[in-house]
Amino acid sequence: MLVSYKWLKELVDVDVTTAELAEKMSTTGIEVEGVETPAEGLSKLVVGHIVSCEDVPDTHLHLCQVDTGDDELRQVVCGAPNVKTGINVIVAVPGARIADNYKIKKGKIRGMESLGMICSLQELGLSESIIPKEFSDGIQILPEGAIPGDSIFSYLDLDDEIIELSITPNRADALSMRGVAHEVAAIYGKKVHFEEKNLIEEAERAADKISVVIESDKVLSYSARIVKNVTVAPSPQWLQNKLMNAGIRPINNVVDVTNYVLLTYGQPMHAFDFDKFDGTTIVARNAENGEKLITLDGEERDLIADDLVIAVNDQPVALAGVMGGQSTEIGSSSKTVVLEAAVFNGTSIRKTSGRLNLRSESSSRFEKGINYDTVSEAMDFAAAMLQELAGGQVLSGQVTEGVLPTEPVEVSTTLGYVNTRLGTELTYTDIEEVFEKLGFAISGSEVKFTVLVPRRRWDIAIQADLVEEIARIYGYEKLPTTLPEAGATAGELTSMQRLRRRVRTVAEGAGLSEIITYALTTPEKAVQFSTQATNITELMWPMTVDRSALRQNVVSGMLDTIAYNVARKNSNLAVYEIGKVFEQTGNPKEDLPTEVETFTFALTGLVEEKDFQTKAKPVDFFYAKGIVEALFIKLKLDVTFVAQKGLASMHPGRTATILLDGKEIGFVGQVHPQTAKQYDIPETYVAEINLSTIESQMNQALIFEDITKYPSVSRDIALLLAESVSHHDIVSAIETSGVKRLTAIKLFDVYAGNNIAEGYKSMAYSLTFQNPNDNLTDEEVAKYMEKITKSLVEKVNAEIR
């Protein structure tokens, strides 16, 4: 919110420096971002009256004789398309400073002497977005009464001081000049004095011309007024100055009035051209899926049922609370204006403006709240201004649908409650003084008092809110310093926090270093290593194209980190990250993504470097898999690894899917050589594990089992198998043999070569058996081995050696 200090002083008698005011407002609850003076850095800019203006042949230039209050006319060469005889302009005389500290000097253009420069507002440093459209491509024309030689600062209010406020959602009442004036008045114990307009209505009734219908519960109130015989023209300079200093571009007197009322009251308004209506009934309703509307910015908007529209004859003419429609836009030929003042559901407006990426001054106020008490007053004020500035005739009455509560909100508390919370010894008289400054009525006594909170302060509803107001206005610096009183509370980690700690212990114990990568990446990298890619959630306004989409995997960002290090000769890396990925199964423009906690690590280079005793040991698949196994041993969870050949960007022969109770929870393996080449990194192994799924398993109750006092028995078995048979196949065959007393399977030897037929290999296992309730006999163990042997022969075609 940009607050003009000149304008503020019209509403409340305050005569302090802006620095002092900013400090005071910040300490009482409204943060001040800063104070700027538009004229800062500018000098020697005066009013000039163009006495004559001649075109320079074969150029776009004009040779002007300008009266700048000196004894002689000043010759200035100007190339602006709208320069002409008889107008008042901004002249930078030699020695003047304009935007970017540029100094104006005497010079020659096409051989013609130029004793200064006729300036546009852009050349004074004003933003393109706030310059009136009529002057956006040329010089600024000053009012007819401007006196040649006078400083231009007062004519354009460039000598004003602009206070930028950072308004939090709970203080949306300060999104208006009246709201800020109330706040400043309370701080300094002053009274506000707001301008009142004398509205003169015609005998003709507005209700005879139009009617209003509300067909959505998202519309709390809708009011309309008709002003006829208006003359659309540029606004007077004082109004344009106020709008520009508030960051709003002047358009014409009708539109500018609605924006002025928006700034004054915080009440969004809209003006329709009544003659462009194809009907007389204004309907506030939900849009229909697939309905379209071209808004004032010329963009065609695709609407959905959650959007609110204003319709006439079943055709949308405005996107309610956000932006008007082009079909009923006020133009230079408009004669009859329909003014709108409404209250729409803030949540609905926020969703619509967010979905369409269409933020406006109106939408921001509807999102944060509207003062119900001044909706009707703002409408009448706008109509009266159109009488003054556009010569309009106001038809009698507002056409209104919906009733708004306007009575004050009663909040009761006690003096004891206030003093206990603040640690003070305030009296009832002190409390009365505070609420008198705020403009709140108060009644009662020290035992109990009731405060009537006006509707302009919709953030106050409970006792604690009253305490906050008392503390703000009384002064935080006056509150006594006391030690906090609080009993000890037992803290506890969440299950996910505990899981993160255990994962971090294993990772760092394995020699991994923690890193944090960006959650935003490119759309391509967002899904590159995803096992089940979902819809991509993209930002509407990304800072860079490389950070435009929420990631669905952590691996791609981790590989960027590895590439960065490898490029700087740091080639032996072992890193991990515990972070979130974002899965989107719905519509990214409407639904929030699901956040999934993951554990990811990456390994590249050497595990052990070469020395005089040992060879260098590079990272391999089994080293990475071993870290995963160590993690699940720590977590006391049984997982299985299944060869995976179809995972994008991963090596088809060195990648495994990780299964927990048959459910896929991640993968481990080598990055595909082609992908590694794209990242410009050497052979790299990665793993990504879904911690959110593991968390649910961690919460299962553990069943205690007695430690058996009976010894275990081990038997070794050597198998001759085809090379295609995997360790997993063998373990599966053993486990499904139906032997209940089998407690452990350990592979201790693999051999292929001499004395083994080509295409075959030898694998030796140690099998452990144990009966928790009795000693195992040799006969029992022999039967178990027979079952296992039979299963191996039948299921993997093994030959017992």
UniProtKB/Swiss-Prot annotation:
Keyword terms of this UniProt record: Aminoacyl-tRNA synthetase, ATP-binding, Cytoplasm, Ligase, Magnesium, Metal-binding, Nucleotide-binding, Protein biosynthesis, RNA-binding, tRNA-binding
Top-level EC class: ligase
A Pfam family per the record: B3_4
Domain of life of the organism encoding this protein: Bacteria
CDD domains found in the cross-reference section: PheRS_beta_core, tRNA_bind_bactPheRS
Annotated cofactor note: Binds 2 magnesium ions per tetramer.
Subcellular location: Cytoplasm
Residue ranges of the TM segments: none
Listed cofactors: Mg(2+)
UniProt EC number: 6.1.1.20
GO annotation, cellular component aspect: phenylalanine-tRNA ligase complex
Entry-linked SMART domains: B3_4 (SM00873), B5 (SM00874), FDX-ACB (SM00896)
Residue numbers binding Mg(2+): D459, D465, E468, E469
Family recorded in the similarity comment: Belongs to the phenylalanyl-tRNA synthetase beta subunit family. Type 1 subfamily.
Protein name per the record: Phenylalanine--tRNA ligase beta subunit
Organism: Streptococcus agalactiae serotype III (strain NEM316)
Gene assigned in the entry: pheT
